[in-house]
Amino acid sequence: MAAPSEVAAAVLGEGDGGAFGSWLDGRLEALGVDRAVYAAYILGVLQEEEEEEKLDALQGILSAFLEEESLLDICKEIVERWSETRDVTTKVKKEDEVQAIATLIEKQAQIVVKPRVVSEEEKQRKAALLAQYADVTDEEDEADKKDDAGASTANVSSDRTLFRNTNVEDVLNARKLERDSLRDESQRKKEQDKLQREKDKLAKQERKEKEKKRTQKGERKR
């Protein structure tokens, strides 16, 4: 499984998401938070959590670094910035997908089936066969030619339609598999995020306990 930082880099590097990634890195650095580690965890929360749960999850991540008075406002700022970026990115991706399918259909419609080239030897063989069956009337021969032409046209049209529909279906299936893979990867990363948040909370609690002991020790000396 890819490391969280690699997953974050892959997602934040796409389209307008890159702008959000740059903004988030700068914001975390200004707050004194390790952006190389926590940008990935924050991204996982923004992608996977429900809207009403995003703020709580972000507060759980950043509470080890921020004062309680400013924690909520900063988390709201991150969520709002993410929502604005995702609205733009989603619109662009949908337009790109529609354009890709339209282009594929257009290309398939332009495919021209080359007519079969009949060699001189085949022509001679056909002429010999016709000579053996001289009782075949001109009317029957003309009717057969018309039937053959109609059947060929129908077959070519059917083949084109089938080829075009198959390719469009392949494109849609490939995109679905890609989305499923990203969703599974995000779910695994989300579980890692929760473990990391628990570690951060314990570390914060330990720091508070140590600070409390130092304060009490100083008071006893006085």
Swiss-Prot record:
Residues 172-209 have a biased composition (Basic and acidic residues). Residues 152-168 have a biased composition (Polar residues). Residues 136-222 are annotated as: Disordered. There is a cross-link at residue 93 (Glycyl lysine isopeptide (Lys-Gly) (interchain with G-Cter in SUMO1)). One of its GO terms (cellular component) is cytosol. The modification Phosphothreonine is found at residue 137. Belongs to the CCDC43 family. This is Coiled-coil domain-containing protein 43. It comes from Mus musculus. The lineage of its organism: Eukaryota, Metazoa, Chordata, Craniata, Vertebrata.
